[in-house]
Amino acid sequence: MSFKAAEVSSLSERINWEKVDGLVPAIVQDFQSSQVLMMGYMNQDALAKTGETGQVTFFSRTKERLWTKGETSGNVLQLVNISLDCDNDTLLVRVNPIGPTCHTGTTTCWDGDAQEESQMVWLHQLEQLLAARKSADPDSSYTASLYARGTKRISQKVGEEGVEVALAATSGDKAELVCESADLIYHLLVLLQDQGLSMNDVVNKLKERHK
């Protein structure tokens, strides 16, 4: 039994399955961006299979069977962790989504409502775009050309943009400071991706220092 399966088994034992009529709501959240992706229902078997396979599986109330998200589309939800709420009757399932989550092709099942994107969600989407550019033709974009030139050049650009930010601040030009800060953050994100890291790693370090 894997660690995830053992952890899920322990969670299952805390759920009063009789109280919830055999089904618990499972809220699915993107682990990186914290964006809520969808909601489904799990019975004991669906929860167990999720832990065993590492891919989120629900119980379909209409088809009356287990179904693994993405079993036909390939847009699976890779399990990161699961937690129970304080009443032990609702699951929060954190995942790494592979492709769009909604069957309509949108990122979440609420995208059709034109919900306002949070800043962190947009930043995560930018990181995904930058990650995709790593394997792109160097002539196809500035980002791809940066990756092709290697870590030394990317690091140099981060240094240059840092100086530009400092100069903009000392000049008192706030509009220029915003523009130069955007350039710095962009190049820093490229450098993090180049090193196999993300902004989440930086945020986690900040949280650690704040404790």
Swiss-Prot record:
It catalyses: 1-(5-phospho-beta-D-ribosyl)-ATP + H2O = 1-(5-phospho-beta-D-ribosyl)-5'-AMP + diphosphate + H(+); 1-(5-phospho-beta-D-ribosyl)-5'-AMP + H2O = 1-(5-phospho-beta-D-ribosyl)-5-[(5-phospho-beta-D-ribosylamino)methylideneamino]imidazole-4-carboxamide. The keyword RNA-binding does not apply. Its EC number is 3.5.4.19, 3.6.1.31. Residues 123-211 are annotated as: Phosphoribosyl-ATP pyrophosphohydrolase. The keyword Nucleotide-binding applies. Pathway: Amino-acid biosynthesis; L-histidine biosynthesis; L-histidine from 5-phospho-alpha-D-ribose 1-diphosphate: step 2/9; Amino-acid biosynthesis; L-histidine biosynthesis; L-histidine from 5-phospho-alpha-D-ribose 1-diphosphate: step 3/9. GO terms for molecular function: ATP binding; phosphoribosyl-AMP cyclohydrolase activity; phosphoribosyl-ATP diphosphatase activity. Keywords: Amino-acid biosynthesis, ATP-binding, Cytoplasm, Histidine biosynthesis, Hydrolase, Multifunctional enzyme, Nucleotide-binding. It is found in: Cytoplasm. GO terms for biological process: L-histidine biosynthetic process. Residues 1-122 are annotated as: Phosphoribosyl-AMP cyclohydrolase. GO terms for cellular component: cytoplasm. HAMAP family: HisE (MF_01020), HisIE (MF_01019). In the N-terminal section; belongs to the PRA-CH family. In the C-terminal section; belongs to the PRA-PH family. NCBIfam families: histidine_hisI, PRK00051.1, PRK02759.1. This is Histidine biosynthesis bifunctional protein HisIE. It comes from Vibrio parahaemolyticus serotype O3:K6 (strain RIMD 2210633). The lineage of its organism: Bacteria, Pseudomonadati, Pseudomonadota, Gammaproteobacteria, Vibrionales.
